[in-house]
């Protein structure tokens, strides 16, 4: 079966990379805006946490991925090549993933949402309320749409074997 027959992409179009990263950067930006209400040190900590997560993904996952050195839906295959040496592709689909593994990724938007709720309890303002709602929608729906319709559905690594795809597979039988 060829990539075209499976619907898999060898390299993703730049438009998909832009949309996928736009969702992430909006989450990061809105999260930083909310946390700024608590002080600049919270924003710095938040940004360092995000950078740590990004380097963790690129250093531990992207290096073994089919898209290492290629344009994946998030562009990280190209970026990881700059910072890290090629890993072992056969190792990628041998990895396992559970819900604990993705908690840090959820914390990127849940911490600012909780901080925003705390601000709203202290004093309700429409701007903070709006940011919390938008962040909630981007964090859950935005990520689900990007991964479900733009990224994972057309991913060659998913076809080869991906622990995240296995975790989120709603058709699996137990």
What role is predicted for each listed range?
Residues 1-28, 174:
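Cytosolic-side membrane-entry/anchor segment at the start of a transmembrane helix
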Residues 21-28, 95-117:
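Core segments of transmembrane alpha-helices
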Residues 66-69, 76, 156-159, 163-166:
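Cys/His-coordinated zinc-binding microdomains
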Residues 74-100:
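Short membrane-interface loop/juxtamembrane segments of multi-pass integral membrane proteins
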Residues 6-18, 33-34, 98-103, 123-124:
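Short, amphipathic, aromatic/basic-enriched membrane-interface segments that mark the entry/exit
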Residues 28-40:
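Short, hydrophobic transmembrane alpha-helix segments
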Residues 37-70, 138-147:
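Hydrophobic alpha-helical membrane-embedded segments
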Residues 121-164:
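Alpha-helical transmembrane segments and their immediate juxtamembrane interface regions
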């Amino acid at each position: 079966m060829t990539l075209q027959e499976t619907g898999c992409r060898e390299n993703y179009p730049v438009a998909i990379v832009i949309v996928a990263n736009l969702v992430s950067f909006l989450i990061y930006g809105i999260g930083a805006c909310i946390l700024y209400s608590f002080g600049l040190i919270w924003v710095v900590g938040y940004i360092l946490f995000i950078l740590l997560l990004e380097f963790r993904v690129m250093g531990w996952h992207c290096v073994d991925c089919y898209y290492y050195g290629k344009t994946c839906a998030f562009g990280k295959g190209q970026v990881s090549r700059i910072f890290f040496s090629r890993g072992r592709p056969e190792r990628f689909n041998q990895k396992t993933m559970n819900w604990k593994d993705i908690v840090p990724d959820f914390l990127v938007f849940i911490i600012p949402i909780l901080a925003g709720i705390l601000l709203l309890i202290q004093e309700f303002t429409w701007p903070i309320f709006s940011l919390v709602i938008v962040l909630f929608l981007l964090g859950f729906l935005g990520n689900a749409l990007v991964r479900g319709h733009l990224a994972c559905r057309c991913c060659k690594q998913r076809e080869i074997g991906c622990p995240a795809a296995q975790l989120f597979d709603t058709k699996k039988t137990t």
